[in-house]
Amino acid sequence: MKKLILSLLCSIALNVQAQERIILLNEGNWQSDNGKISYFEDGKIVSNQWFRDANKRKLGDTPNDIIQINEDLIAITINWSNIIQFISPDGKRVAETEDVPNNRKLATDGRYVYVSSYGHECGTINGYEMFTKGYVAKIDIHTFEVVATCEVGYEPEGIAYYKGHLFVANTGGYAFQEDHEYETTVSIIDAETMQLVRDVDTG
């Protein structure tokens, strides 16, 4: 049984038949298109360009987060390239979506992937939706399409799934250049309906 550990360093570790495998996401330099994935087995580095080796192409510009959805699928947000890349555990591309621009962090319930976004638009199965603030997109892992969205606060970052709800940290990170204040709220979303339950002010 594969086990997943997600660390603050945006790495995932899998224990498969006593072999430790670590996949480490490297953001690279902003606007330099040099993001990459490093791959380790049993504490030894196998490749510092794991995605490129497997797919003969670059990963993209400023990858931001990585999560294992199930035993067959891993998702990566690539912020400045405006791509969510889906790969298999051997590093090969499965699918990608460009429907969630300025994507940030990831959460999953094993059936869907939930992505926070600083953006103000999103491509969904029902057409394009526009937002005043940031939002969370719900992606079907079988079709890789956005099936629902929920507007939250400005510039949402961290997102977690727990017992049917999503908890989203709003930052207001663009307050220095846009006409709004910094945020101190956490938005709670019903993951099934993608309806906002309430905002909690953390002070």
Regions found by a protein language model. Give the residues of each.
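Positively charged n-region of N-terminal signal peptides that target proteins for export
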Residues: M1-L4, A18
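Predominantly soluble domains enriched in secretory-pathway, periplasmic, or organellar proteins
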Residues: A18-G203
